[in-house]
Each structure stands twice: as structure tokens, then as C-alpha cells.
């Protein structure tokens, strides 16, 4: 009985020790989305709850292209696998909120048509939508210094009405 109690105590202490990573990072990245068909920029906050499990909050904004703009907010989970000295790979899963807007969706031949449309539709011919979706993908990171990492990531976002692949690269800084 004493051996079982000792084994349980050692297991609990080990579990607690592995959960004390508590590292926090902030970062910035550049990305390309296949649905936006343009580059975007983003910021992220990461929190390692264990040595292998990391939570991440991300905000991305895509530059306007042909009247189309988009931003998204993501919450992802990573499971880090050390694959070489200073290199880690990770799968990711998460959720996203995406908002997009297309200006000039309806074209007008005259000012009267535009006024009629605005009175009946309430918009200037723009179309916009917001939706929730899922993220699935993976990434790789390289530890440049004790405080700086570079990384690349590829994820697929399932968004109601439109799915998109997003590729990105950026830097993170340990706080």
C-alpha cells in the first residue's frame, strides 16, 4: 500500500512539474489567404500551459483588394513536438470568427439607380457577412535566441459559405 501511495505522489508531482512551463509570447506575422486573394497581417498571443500544450489567440486583417476586405479572430490549440535542436513542429486545431465585406457588389448605371437601391436595400451595393468556423493545420518554429522564434504555419479554415487556406510566417517574442 505504501508503494502505491508513493507511486501516486510521484506521478502527481511529475504532472505538476510538467505544467509549470507557463511561458507567454506575443508575435506578428504576414499571411496570404486564398479566399481573400491578398496578403494580410496579424498579431498573436500564445500561452504555454505545459511544455507541449500551447493556447493561442490571433487577430488577422487582410488588405483591401478589388473592394474585398476581411478580418478574422482565432483561438487555436497547439501540441508541440521537438523534432531537432531548437526546432518544434505542431498540429493545430481551433475556432475562428471571420467578417468580410465586398464593396461595389452591385453596380449602378445612374445616380437614380443608386438612390433607389439605397432606399430599398439600405446599402451602397456592398455585401458583408460574418461567420464562425473551425481551423485545422500545422506549423513549425525555430528558436533564434532565448526570447525570439521564427515560424511558418499552414491552416485550413472552414467557414460557412466559404473555406480558405491560409499560409503565414512571422516572429514571436517571449515575455
Please state what every model-predicted region is:
Residues 113-127, 131-133:
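Internal catalytic-core helix/loop-beta-alpha segment
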Residues 1-23, 114:
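Cleavable N-terminal export/targeting peptides
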Residues 24-28, 55-57, 73, 89-93, ...:
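Transmembrane beta-strands of outer-membrane beta-barrel proteins
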Residues 29-41, 62-70, 131, 157-167:
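Solvent-exposed loop/turn segments connecting transmembrane beta-strands
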Amino acid at each position: 500500500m505504501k508503494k502505491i501511495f508513493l507511486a501516486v505522489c510521484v506521478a502527481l508531482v511529475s504532472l505538476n512539474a510538467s505544467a509549470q512551463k507557463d511561458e507567454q509570447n506575443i508575435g506578428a506575422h504576414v499571411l496570404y489567404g486564398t479566399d481573400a486573394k491578398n496578403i494580410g497581417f496579424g498579431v498573436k498571443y500564445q500561452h504555454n500551459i505545459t511544455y507541449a500544450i500551447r493556447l493561442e489567440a490571433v487577430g488577422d486583417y487582410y488588405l483591401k483588394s478589388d473592394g474585398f476586405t476581411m478580418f478574422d479572430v482565432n483561438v487555436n490549440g497547439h501540441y508541440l513536438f521537438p523534432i531537432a535542436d531548437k526546432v518544434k513542429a505542431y498540429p493545430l486545431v481551433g475556432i475562428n470568427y471571420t467578417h468580410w465585406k465586398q464593396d461595389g457588389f452591385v453596380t449602378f448605371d445612374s445616380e437614380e439607380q443608386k438612390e433607389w437601391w439605397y432606399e430599398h436595400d439600405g446599402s451602397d451595393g456592398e455585401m458583408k457577412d460574418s461567420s464562425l468556423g473551425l481551423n485545422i493545420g500545422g506549423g513549425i518554429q525555430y528558436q533564434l535566441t532565448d526570447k525570439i522564434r521564427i515560424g511558418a504555419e499552414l491552416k485550413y479554415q472552414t467557414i460557412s459559405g466559404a473555406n480558405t487556406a491560409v499560409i503565414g510566417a512571422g516572429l514571436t517574442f517571449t515575455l
